[in-house]
């Protein structure tokens, strides 16, 4: 068993060295197991047996018995997943940029018969197919898309390999691009492009920040003006309501005063009290005219207060003698002579005040 393992390891090392050199390997028959009649096939391996030079059967893992001399183990295929490094190669993109690119290929033998008789060396064939497919797919893409669409590029290479390798009994599980090397000048231009893009983004972000700041300031001023106008409106409404309440209160107070005055006039000596009030207001009016106005209205004898009071009493007496229009007394009298006499006396009294 140790001898068989050593022979298998030597065969794999030989195959790997041939793949790295880029030459198609030739299968060495010296590393194959010998027919010892009773054979034990390891797990995940398939041994292809030929009988008298023709394919006979495939030995499955476990105990197997062969006929000496007639049966011969011709191929040993591993059913495990195989990892192959695809050598670095040059490829030209759609925009005429030369790249150095390599990758890793993951495959598995699905049909040992096709892998043994369909191609001389399936692993080498798949490696060459991966290289040519990668060059073909890179020629369809620009340099920017090669970096942006690595996953789609890997999927395209896997699909192309599976279509061609189906007759070889091999299935490509996945393909991964390892490194992409660009020329120094292209790398410098890409770096400049990245820096320009960053400056552009910074400028755009700065302008957006300035715009948002201006919008926020304008919105704040707008809200401040709206609040100020609403406050002024509320103040005016409150002021108007206060003034209306004050006017109403004054009117009610004045009406109450008039009612009280009217009630007082109907009492005993009410006329005398009214005459005294009129005289006081008469004298106060002359005092205000003398203080607040440039036009001075003086009575005939300003030093005689008694005469001023007498004049005021005369005006009040003339007013009290005149009937009030619409009252029952004025309507029932029907005498125009009394009204004319009252008007005449009132006019005479006013003329006398003016003359004095």
From Swiss-Prot:
It is a peripheral membrane protein; Lipid-anchor. Pfam families: Band_7, Band_7_C. The keyword Ribosomal protein does not apply. Residues 329-343 have a biased composition (Polar residues). Ubiquitously expressed at low levels. Expressed in lymphoid tissues (at protein level). It is found in: Cell membrane; Mitochondrion; Mitochondrion inner membrane; Mitochondrion intermembrane space. The modification N6-acetyllysine is found at residues 145, 233. One of its GO terms (biological process) is mitochondrial protein processing. Its main location: membrane. Keywords: Acetylation, Cell membrane, Coiled coil, Cytoplasm, Cytoskeleton, Lipid-binding, Lipoprotein, Membrane, Mitochondrion, Mitochondrion inner membrane, Phosphoprotein, Transit peptide. The modification N6-succinyllysine is found at residue 145. Mitochondrial protein that probably regulates the biogenesis and the activity of mitochondria. Stimulates cardiolipin biosynthesis, binds cardiolipin-enriched membranes where it recruits and stabilizes some proteins including prohibitin and may therefore act in the organization of functional microdomains in mitochondrial membranes. Through regulation of the mitochondrial function may play a role into several biological processes including cell migration, cell proliferation, T-cell activation, calcium homeostasis and cellular response to stress. This is Stomatin-like protein 2, mitochondrial. It comes from Homo sapiens. The gene is STOML2.
């Amino acid at each position: 068993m140790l001898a068989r393992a050593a022979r298998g390891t030597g065969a794999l090392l030989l195959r790997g060295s041939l793949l790295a050199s880029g030459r198609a390997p030739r299968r060495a028959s010296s590393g194959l197991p010998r027919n010892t009649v009773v054979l034990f096939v390891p797990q995940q391996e398939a041994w292809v047996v030929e009988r008298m030079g023709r394919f006979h059967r495939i030995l499955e893992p476990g105990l197997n018995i062969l006929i000496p001399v007639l049966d011969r183990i011709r191929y040993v295929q591993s059913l495990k997943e195989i990892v192959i490094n695809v050598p670095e190669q040059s490829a030209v993109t759609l925009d005429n940029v030369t790249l150095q690119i390599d990758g890793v290929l993951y495959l598995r033998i699905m049909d040992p018969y096709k892998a043994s008789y369909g191609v001389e060396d399936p692993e080498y064939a798949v490696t060459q197919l991966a290289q040519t497919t990668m060059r073909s797919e890179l020629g369809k893409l620009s340099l920017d898309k090669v970096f942006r669409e690595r996953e789609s590029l890997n999927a395209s290479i896997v699909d192309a390999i599976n279509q061609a390798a189906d007759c070889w009994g091999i299935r490509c599980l996945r393909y991964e691009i390892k490194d992409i090397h660009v020329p120094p000048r292209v790398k410098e231009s890409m770096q400049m492009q990245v820096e320009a893009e960053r400056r552009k983004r910074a400028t755009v972000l700065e302008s957006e920040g300035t715009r948002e700041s201006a919008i926020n300031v304008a919105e704040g001023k707008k809200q401040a003006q709206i609040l100020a106008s609403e406050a002024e409106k509320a103040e005016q409404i409150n002021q108007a309501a206060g003034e209306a309440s004050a006017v109403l209160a004054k009117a009610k107070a004045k009406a109450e005063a008039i009612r009280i005055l009217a009630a007082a006039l109907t009492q005993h000596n009410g006329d005398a009290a009214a005459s005294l009030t009129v005289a006081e207001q008469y004298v106060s009016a002359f005092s205000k005219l003398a203080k607040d106005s440039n036009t001075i209205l003086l009575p005939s004898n300003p030093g005689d207060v008694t005469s001023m009071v007498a004049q005021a009493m005369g005006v009040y007496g003339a007013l009290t003698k005149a009937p009030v229009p619409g009252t029952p007394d004025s309507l029932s009298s029907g005498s125009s002579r009394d009204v004319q006499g009252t008007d005449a006396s009132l006019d005479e009294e006013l003329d006398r005040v003016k003359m004095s």
